[in-house]
């Protein structure tokens, strides 16, 4: 313990009355006296001044005065009840017992400005803004980048990621066809169609059926011979049963004379008939024809030479028109490029709208279902079912190039003409000087 220094116990307790004068801070008292003297010198002590000297009441009328709505009967009765409770004398209530576990606070009644606000009535509600019709298909849902972020691409990317507006990268979808997945049937195929639509629909199906019948008749007519009569089995049997029959045009005597004449001729020639040699005649050209031919050949040669000279002269002149030639070539190249772009578009459209050969089979479209006039019932209970959903789905997938069509397997074709291969046998090799056995 250091000598000459008093401890806390020796100083005395701070809770006693003797410590009040010892523990007072003189600096706070001096500051308050200084502030009061300064206020008195400038205009007066603020704590001693009245409210009228300190504040000014603004009594000018406001431009937009709030509209005070009229109170209903219920609101007027409630307001009178509240004002009556306020004007009544205050009654002291006994202090609640501390033994109760739950202390309930009394409801606070409106006082002062709250009563004036109730007299004025509730504020007029602002007109609610009408909600705009939101259309998913026409509204542009792409995220908008603020103008402050447009200058920096990294800031824009970061903004979209933080705001959760940037969509994740997804693999591209391959579109196989632009055709609709489900084809809606025409009005004439209904169970209760209109007369005009039904007639048009049935006429179209009848026309397709007539085309098929005509095609089959054409094939059948092409198989049968046109100018010959095909003999049936019964006609062939009758012909064989008749035996040998001589035509009435030829008689027996004529045939015997012809046979005798032929035998005499063969005896004279010694049994061999020499064929007669026919004289071959060839037309010779006259002198005038030869002169005309030579003159025509000479004119052809001169014309050919003249055209060659003209082509050479034109090539020599092309040196001085290089700009025009370049321009013509550029225009030709531009036109060729435009034509190629058009071909590419047509090719893409055909690929997405037409059938492709995905299998060995051939695509045959399903027949359109139809009902006869006596089968039209007018209600679904008595309707005769036609077609099948699975058949429609199968045809739809094949039409949209999503399913191959099976067919006969292609047979392996063997070449008729085989390649010749030269093979030199060891026993037939030529032995020359310097050869050795391997």
From Swiss-Prot:
Disruption phenotype: RNAi-mediated inactivation of the gene induces lower oxygen consumption rate of the worms. Residues 12-21 have a biased composition (Basic residues). GO terms for biological process: positive regulation of cellular respiration; ribosomal large subunit assembly; rRNA processing. GO terms for cellular component: nucleolus; nucleoplasm. Its main location: nucleus. The keyword Nucleus applies. One of its GO terms (molecular function) is 5S rRNA binding. Residues 265-288, 297-318, 325-346 have a biased composition (Basic and acidic residues). Keywords: Nucleus, Ribosome biogenesis. The keyword Metal-binding does not apply. PANTHER family: GLIOMA SUPPRESSOR CANDIDATE REGION GENE 2 (PTHR14211), RIBOSOME BIOGENESIS PROTEIN NOP53 (PTHR14211:SF7). Belongs to the NOP53 family. This is Ribosome biogenesis protein NOP53. It comes from Caenorhabditis elegans.
């Amino acid at each position: 313990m250091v000598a000459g220094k008093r401890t806390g116990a020796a100083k005395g307790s701070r809770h006693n009355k003797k410590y009040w004068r010892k523990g007072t801070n003189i600096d706070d008292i001096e500051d308050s006296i200084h502030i009061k003297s300064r206020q008195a010198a400038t205009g007066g002590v603020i704590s001693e001044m009245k409210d009228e000297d300190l504040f000014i009441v603004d009594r000018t009328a406001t431009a937009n005065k709030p509209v005070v709505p009229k109170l209903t009967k219920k609101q007027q009765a409630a307001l009178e009840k509240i004002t009556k409770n306020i004007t009544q004398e205050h009654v002291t209530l006994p202090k609640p017992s501390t033994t109760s576990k739950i202390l309930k606070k009394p409801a606070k009644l409106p006082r002062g400005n709250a009563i004036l606000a109730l007299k004025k009535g509730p504020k007029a509600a602002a007109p609610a803004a009408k909600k705009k019709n939101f259309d998913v298909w026409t509204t542009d849902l792409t995220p908008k980048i603020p103008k402050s972020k447009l200058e920096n691409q990294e800031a824009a990317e970061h903004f979209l990621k933080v705001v959760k507006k940037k969509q994740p990268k997804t693999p591209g979808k391959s579109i196989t066809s632009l055709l609709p997945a489900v084809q809606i049937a025409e009005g004439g195929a209904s169970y209760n169609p209109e007369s005009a639509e039904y007639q048009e629909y049935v006429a179209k199906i009848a026309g397709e059926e007539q085309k098929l019948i005509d095609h089959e008749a054409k094939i059948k007519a092409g198989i049968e011979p046109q100018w010959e009569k095909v003999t049936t089995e019964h006609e062939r049997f009758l012909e064989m049963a008749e035996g040998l029959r001589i035509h009435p045009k030829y008689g027996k005597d004529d045939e015997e004379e012809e046979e005798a004449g032929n035998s005499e001729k063969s005896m004279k020639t010694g049994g061999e008939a020499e064929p007669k040699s026919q004289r071959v005649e060839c037309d010779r050209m006259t002198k005038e024809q030869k002169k005309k031919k030579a003159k025509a050949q000479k004119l052809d040669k001169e014309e050919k030479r003249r055209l060659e000279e003209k082509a050479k002269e034109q090539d020599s002149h092309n040196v001085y028109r290089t700009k025009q030639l370049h321009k013509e070539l550029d225009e030709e190249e531009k036109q060729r490029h435009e034509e190629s772009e058009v071909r590419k578009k047509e090719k893409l459209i055909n690929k997405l709208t037409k059938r492709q050969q995905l299998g060995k089979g051939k695509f045959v479209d399903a027949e359109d279902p139809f009902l006869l006039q006596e089968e039209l019932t007018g209600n679904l209970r008595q309707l005769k079912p036609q077609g099948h959903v699975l058949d429609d789905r199968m045809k739809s997938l094949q039409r949209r190039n999503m399913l191959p069509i099976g067919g006969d397997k292609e047979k392996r074709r063997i070449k008729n003409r085989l390649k010749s291969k030269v093979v030199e046998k060891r026993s037939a090799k030529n032995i020359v000087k310097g050869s050795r056995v391997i």
